[in-house]
């Protein structure tokens, strides 16, 4: 049994029992195994407005680690997972540093908040520890804030905007149109608004209004009244977390009929809104209805274990853990610098889609397919999860994957 300085065995057992009684948001999970395990740190929001997404992330990373260990681990060594609630940027930084300095993790995986992702990446860079971001979208993390030891399986905001933008252009909702946007008032939202304005300017549209919304806001009625008065051609959501769920529910209650679309999206938030409350066109990095053998297996395994299908955050954390294990096996090393070199050489990874993905060397963004989903009419909804139809993969099969990503001119990255 490995020991943990400052935490007695009795404290760990009591905490674990409390965590089992209260669910995954309880005491941080620490698995104790043989001394030659590979320790990996997992940080993600498990409380607050991003907590519902963090719950999927934790469940998925547990599933991935259990599968890896059941298959013999990595190079004969089991993975030991240390999981913590990242809470906020300052706490995320503190916990990341503790994981590296005290717990000697080989790498860190996770996060959803772009602000917390930035502080974790600073620790990772200073300590030369691999950090694989699974949920932070901001272009800035791949641009001004890019780091040698940070990689992104989650798509950047530009990829979300360009993917959804294709559908909006096809629907005639861009050129000459007026948009009313609602934006989460933190790093992710600010970055997404900047990217969406760039897209709109390039395609002949304009904003009737853009409103910043505090992350703890729950009452959208004043903004809905403004939307009603503005009579926009399209209402755009740059919201995040349970903001999206609350907005969609209240939009329906107000009886507004203006088309809705979003540039930031997680399927769990649409599920939370409920039947009849999900509207419009949205981009997504992955969803549970993708028709590939790998997706079908993941959905079946996750649903059997947790009683519900996985959503896109679950996809990100699950695949991040799997690709880290794959890279460690291929390099026969857990050294972060060697793993960085392996990723930068164009290693390919199966991501449950029709094409393999790879990390772009210039900014460490995963190049992979995305999708646009369209809310189904209520009469066509058969259950609480299958509430949308999906586009084919974006980009198309004859297009390069990089076509939807930010160009170097749009988002320059200069790594030290």
Predicted regions and their residues:
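Extracytosolic ligand-binding ectodomains
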Residues: 2-17, 24-416
């Amino acid at each position: 049994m490995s020991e943990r300085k400052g935490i007695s065995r009795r404290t760990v057992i009591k905490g674990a029992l409390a965590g089992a009684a209260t669910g995954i948001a309880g005491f941080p999970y620490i698995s104790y195994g043989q001394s030659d395990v590979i320790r990996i740190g997992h940080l993600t929001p498990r409380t607050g407005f991003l907590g519902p997404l963090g719950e999927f992330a934790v469940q998925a990373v547990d599933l991935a680690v259990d599968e890896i260990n059941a298959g013999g681990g990595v190079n004969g060594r089991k993975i030991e997972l240390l999981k913590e609630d990242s809470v906020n940027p300052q706490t995320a930084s503190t916990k990341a540093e503790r994981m590296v300095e005290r717990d000697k993790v080989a790498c860190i995986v996770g996060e959803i908040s772009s602000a917390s992702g930035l502080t974790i990446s600073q620790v990772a860079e200073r300590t030369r520890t691999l950090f694989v971001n699974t949920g932070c979208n901001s272009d800035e993390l791949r641009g001004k804030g890019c780091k040698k030891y940070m990689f992104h399986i989650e798509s950047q905001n530009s990829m979300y905007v360009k993917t959804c933008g294709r559908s909006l252009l096809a629907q005639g909702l861009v050129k000459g149109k007026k948009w009313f946007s609602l934006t989460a008032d933190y790093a992710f939202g600010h970055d997404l608004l900047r990217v969406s304005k760039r897209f709109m300017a390039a395609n002949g549209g304009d904003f009737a209004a853009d409103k910043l919304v505090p992350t703890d806001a729950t009452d959208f009625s004043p903004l809905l009244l403004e939307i009603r008065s503005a009579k926009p051609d399209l209402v755009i959501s740059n919201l995040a977390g349970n903001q999206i769920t609350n907005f969609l529910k209240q939009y329906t209650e107000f009886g507004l009929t203006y088309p809705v679309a979003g540039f930031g999206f997680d399927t769990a938030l649409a599920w939370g809104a409920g039947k009849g409350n999900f509207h419009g066109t949205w981009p997504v990095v992955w969803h549970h209805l993708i028709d590939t053998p790998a997706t079908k297996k993941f959905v079946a395994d996750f649903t059997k274990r947790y009683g519900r299908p996985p959503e896109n955050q679950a996809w990100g954390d699950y695949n991040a853990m799997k690709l880290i294990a794959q890279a460690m096996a291929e390099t026969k090393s857990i050294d972060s610098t060697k793993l960085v070199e392996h990723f930068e050489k164009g290693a390919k990874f199966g991501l449950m889609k029709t094409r393999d993905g790879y990390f772009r060397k210039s900014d460490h963004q995963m190049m992979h397919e995305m999708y646009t989903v369209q809310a189904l009419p209520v009469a066509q909804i058969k259950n609480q999860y299958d509430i949308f139809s999906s586009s084919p993969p974006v980009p198309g099969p004859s297009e390069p994957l990089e076509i939807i990503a930010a160009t170097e001119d749009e988002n320059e990255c200069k790594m030290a």
